[in-house]
């Protein structure tokens, strides 16, 4: 198993020591525009020094009473609270009275401008009734249309005996897997619970949205933005809308927007189906109040969808997909959202790679969370979590509100009824702190600590029985798959409907190098008995077989030209610390001068290390993968590359090896120095992306030697 990334601390800056470029409030702290899951303690709290705490139970509405005929939440006003509110209003002389929003019923598109207020006081009174244009008598034609749509309840497993059999098989790890090839050099593995029955078949590919059961509100406009499917989308769309789990390990710049639109359409459709079912059952119960109807149509809390993203700008892209598919007449707090989540790209990044600009362009702050509430005519940003249909957040943003030192203040009940969980750009989350992702998933679909006003007579049986995780759909999109992501696939994707894993067939990063001359690329395999022992075995091999020749070449002194220009690339920060300390203290390396750059190195020290390396004052330079991920430096003066381990991201291979050609005059000499990379059998996933799928097998099992050279 790969070594932990980073220091394992709770906090993580968006771009190493640089921090986020997004807009911040006064005082230098990130703007914390977020849904509140905790009650606000007004005693002596103000501004950014205040922490939000859990709201009282009576302020939280259950799903069964959340909606009226318009899809709005019902507002129950208590006479005493109303009287107290009027009294407080009459006594307030500190400022003008709040203006009522004028409603224009003829407007097709209305953006509600909200006043920027202190975030604690802005959402302090959660029970304050909202004034919206949905508070009017509906057109009877609209009501009839919604009644037709409400009959489509979606895909559910209401057969308790079948569900029990599937859960029993999953609990005993009884999965039956089938592998196949997909068009476009993709590989598919479909796994479903092995209950001893007939083999489960995947749904047939589709060629457009007309084959999907979409709510009328979405079907009217979705075709304008999602046109004809390619072969990959045709095969995966039925599984996404069929509530299968999916691990998609082939996310690229070219297909990311297409799949983002697909999963946004899916979750919107799911939210509308859930809402219409509740509305329909509310109507049924009101028509026959004397009958004891079994209307189980919801979970413990309202939030049904969780989307985990790496940055605020990624959240903006998801919201752009949502708003173009869900035509709302009003978008409350839209301006506030774009002011605090979006930013312009850095013009100095024009020469940065495309994948870097996609991830870090705009607002790259990785500490955020956002609640979204949908009604028939409105999208409300920054809604309270327990009043939200969807939550968009970064792993760090969620953990900061879930994991409190005081156990009484911990709150993750809002994740108890998540039915669709999505992780986009999982490879970027690996470079932040993957432990936060694991923490969030370990708290999904747990039994809530409080009732939060829940009507338990309407809660589905699998929630009451603690089986919700077996019905939850999980979608994970990543540019590549790592052991950590595979562990998430194995341990957290437990859907009784089955799960898919999509991986591409790799040609190999060694074939696509940005160099004018061929470069010798050597891979040295070392023996490693287990993932636990792999770091120790790697270090011993490096110090004995790799470092010794490097030290001998440095014996001639600092001015020896053959000893300079060695870049040592180290993927893991823990390995970086170990190698750095060894080079600094070992008698073996007393004649080797070196510099070191990690994700925690200050800008000043980075500049000094690069200058000394380029001038030859330092013979070697240690350089970590996370540093390259966050900075994409162009290191000059490189004459040979030693890779302590191959990078997770195959794009980095070409970029690191490309350092050899940054000085055209010395390109031939650098090509002779070449690249040497260390690997073991536990690096199979990384090595497949570097050397290619066809070459990997022989390199892992070859008994005739442990060194492989490609030119």
Curated annotation (Swiss-Prot):
Q: What is the lineage of its organism?
A: Eukaryota, Fungi, Dikarya, Ascomycota, Pezizomycotina
Biological source species: Ajellomyces capsulatus (strain H143)
Compositionally skewed regions (Polar residues) per UniProt: 82-94
Q: What does it do? A: DEAD-box RNA helicase-like protein required for pre-18S rRNA processing, specifically at sites A0, A1, and A2.
Q: Which gene encodes it?
A: UTP25
Write out the biased-composition intervals (Low complexity).
1-17
**Record-given protein name:** U3 small nucleolar RNA-associated protein 25
- Top-rank taxon of the source lineage equals Eukaryota
Enumerate the residue ranges of region (Disordered). Answer: 1-137
- Is Cell inner membrane found in the keyword set? no
GO aspect biological process, one term: maturation of SSU-rRNA from tricistronic rRNA transcript (SSU-rRNA, 5.8S rRNA, LSU-rRNA)
Where found in the cell? Answer: Nucleus, Nucleolus
| GO MF, one annotated term | rRNA binding
Where are stretches of biased composition, namely Acidic residues? Answer: 60-71, 113-137
